[in-house]
Amino acid sequence: MAIDENKQKALAAALGQIEKQFGKGSIMRLGEDRSMNVETISTGSLSLDVALGAGGLPRGRIVEIYGPESYGKTTLTLQVIAAAQREGKICAFIDAEHALDPIYAQKLGVDIDNLLCSQPDTGEQALEICDALSRSGAVDVIVVDSVAALTPKAEIEGEIGDSHVGLAARMMSQAMRKLAGNLKNSNTLLIFINQIRMKIGVMFGNPETTTGGNALKFYASVRLDIRRIGSVKNGDEVVGSETRVKVVKNKIAAPFKQAEFQIMYGEGINTFGELIDLGVKHKLVEKAGAWYSYNGEKIGQGKANATTYLKEHPEMYNELNTKLREMLLNHAGEFTSARDFC
């Protein structure tokens, strides 16, 4: 349907005035190509990058990672930081739980000498630090661990047992309104780790809920639910956990996809074993009985031996990793248009 010429002129003048006053890109037509493709940062897990659809976690957005205790939430965020630092990006970790282990972080590949770290006293202080870092435009990734530990100042200064109904939820709601625009302007990825609580008196449906109210659920572009589905054993010794991550919400690609990988204690995500599994699934690695072969060369009997072989042959690992990424992520931007998933 044709638009009246006078209306077109008036609209063009209004758009020009808006862009002049608020900056280029402050308003645009939804079908335009500019600013539609979302830049991402790898999670450190190829299968999770594929499940996210865009090849990783989106920059300029809010991401929530939640799950039960000791299921790998902090490990996953540290792997994201390590992956970002390998690309020369600046990262910050807001340790509201005061529980970050720098030795463990270093084992996961985090450059602790260049990692910004804060252990705030109150929830307001933590969120103000996030806002200041994002407005600087110099920080690429910010992790907050965790929402449940963001204690409002009034609660800290009050007595134990005082009622503070909805205080944390109001604090988070106000912070989300303030942070969302700044993150978009600075292209900063903000990851919130969250814990699970049980709703009392729920007879039907899922009784689980996350802390901090509903604001984070609405403002998050991606929500990841992380669960342990089994144990990794070396003989009788448990050396890791089988982990499943479900993409519960995704504004940049199709949601509800899942990724499964191993988290090894003291080592993080087993990327070598993950490549073996993906290689077999996509017929780049041959499996005959218990033997694994790549390009006609036997690389091990059993997954553990094949994984060890990949660790000892980085050139083979890099070749297989490159092939799988080209195969699985070549359409990563297919659904990154805002008109597809809002």
From Swiss-Prot:
Highest taxon in the source lineage: Bacteria
Gene3D superfamilies documented for this protein: P-loop containing nucleotide triphosphate hydrolases
A Pfam family: RecA_C
The entry's keywords: ATP-binding, Cytoplasm, DNA damage, DNA recombination, DNA repair, DNA-binding, Nucleotide-binding, SOS response
InterPro entries assigned to the protein according to its UniProt record, in alphabetical order: AAA+_ATPase, DNA_recomb/repair_RecA, DNA_recomb/repair_RecA_CS, P-loop_NTPase, RecA-like_C, RecA-like_N, RecA_ATP-bd, RecA_C_sf
Major location category of this protein: cytoplasm
GO cellular component: cytosol
Role noted for this protein: Can catalyze the hydrolysis of ATP in the presence of single-stranded DNA, the ATP-dependent uptake of single-stranded DNA by duplex DNA, and the ATP-dependent hybridization of homologous single-stranded DNAs. It interacts with LexA causing its activation and leading to its autocatalytic cleavage.
Similarity section: Belongs to the RecA family.
Annotated protein name in UniProt: Protein RecA
The organism of origin for this protein: Pectobacterium carotovorum (Erwinia carotovora)
